[in-house]
From Swiss-Prot:
Residues covered by the Glutamine amidotransferase type-1 domain: 1-206
Pathway(s): Amino-acid biosynthesis; L-histidine biosynthesis; L-histidine from 5-phospho-alpha-D-ribose 1-diphosphate: step 5/9
Function of the protein: IGPS catalyzes the conversion of PRFAR and glutamine to IGP, AICAR and glutamate. The HisH subunit catalyzes the hydrolysis of glutamine to glutamate and ammonia as part of the synthesis of IGP and AICAR. The resulting ammonia molecule is channeled to the active site of HisF.
Catalytic activity as recorded in UniProt: 5-[(5-phospho-1-deoxy-D-ribulos-1-ylimino)methylamino]-1-(5-phospho-beta-D-ribosyl)imidazole-4-carboxamide + L-glutamine = D-erythro-1-(imidazol-4-yl)glycerol 3-phosphate + 5-amino-1-(5-phospho-beta-D-ribosyl)imidazole-4-carboxamide + L-glutamate + H(+); L-glutamine + H2O = L-glutamate + NH4(+)
Lineage, top ranks: Bacteria, Pseudomonadati, Thermodesulfobacteriota, Desulfuromonadia, Desulfuromonadales
Subcellular location: Cytoplasm
GO annotation terms (biological process): L-histidine biosynthetic process
Transmembrane segments: none
Protein name, UniProt field: Imidazole glycerol phosphate synthase subunit HisH
EC number(s) per entry: 4.3.2.10, 3.5.1.2
Active site per the UniProt annotation: C79 (nucleophile), H188, E190
Key words, A-Z: Amino-acid biosynthesis, Cytoplasm, Glutamine amidotransferase, Histidine biosynthesis, Hydrolase, Lyase
GO MF term list: glutaminase activity; imidazoleglycerol-phosphate synthase activity; lyase activity
Subunit structure comment from the entry: Heterodimer of HisH and HisF.
């Protein structure tokens, strides 16, 4: 059973529909007991880091998430769901994350330029990824694939070996992570057309 955590912040229906398009049913739930029973767990997210952590804590989701990861069952984080895996974020202050992957979440500088043009923050739209490691979710995909991003912050892992893909926007940043059973993307697979559907199918196939 694929379970998508509904903690009040995330584009849940589009993620669910993405799985359905590739032949997998996915259950959206706000019940921590259901989350605890998931075979595969998906943590989406949009909004502010602190608000999402507050919602996860208030909803009783933190412990089931940690237990799921520790059990070795597949886990997929999407966008803010990637950032929440990390130790801390500097978004609107200093806030603690789930600390599943050591590292921090930092903001794109406002003065980034490319070929003399000022780059806008948030980073929004299509961008190519460079696959660094053969994460299971990237099976059948190659570097140079375009995916859809919407974010002002990016993750900086303490251990660079967890970086599964990078992208460039004024600087090279981490676009996806992979460590054992934990995979997460800064971009939105559910908005990334055929490439994104392949990622969701690969996760469902695990």
């Amino acid at each position: 059973m694929i379970v998508i955590i509904d903690y009040g912040m995330g584009n849940l229906r589009s993620v669910q529909k993405g799985f359905e398009k590739v032949g997998y049913s996915a259950r959206v739930t706000d019940d921590p007991a259901v989350v605890a029973q998931a075979d595969k767990l998906v943590l989406p997210g949009v909004g502010a880091f602190r608000d999402c952590m507050d919602q996860l804590t208030a909803g009783g989701f933190v412990e089931p998430i940690l237990r799921h990861v520790e059990s070795g069952r597949p886990f997929l984080g999407i966008c803010l769901g990637l950032q929440l895996l990390f130790t801390e974020s500097e978004e609107f202050g200093h806030h603690q994350g789930l600390n599943i992957i050591p590292g921090r979440v930092v903001r794109f500088p406002g003065d980034m330029q490319e070929q003399g043009e000022v780059l806008k923050v948030p980073h929004m739209g299509w961008n190519q990824i460079d696959i660094q490691r053969p994460a299971p979710i990237f099976q059948g995909l190659d570097s140079g694939e375009s995916v859809y991003f919407v974010h002002s912050y990016y993750v900086v892992p303490e251990d660079a070996s967890v970086v599964a893909a990078t992208a460039d926007y004024g600087r090279t940043f981490c676009a996806a992570v992979w460590r054992d059973n934990v995979m997460a993307t800064q971009f939105h697979p559910e908005k990334s057309q055929q490439v994104g559907l392949r990622i969701l199918k690969n996760f469902g196939d695990m």
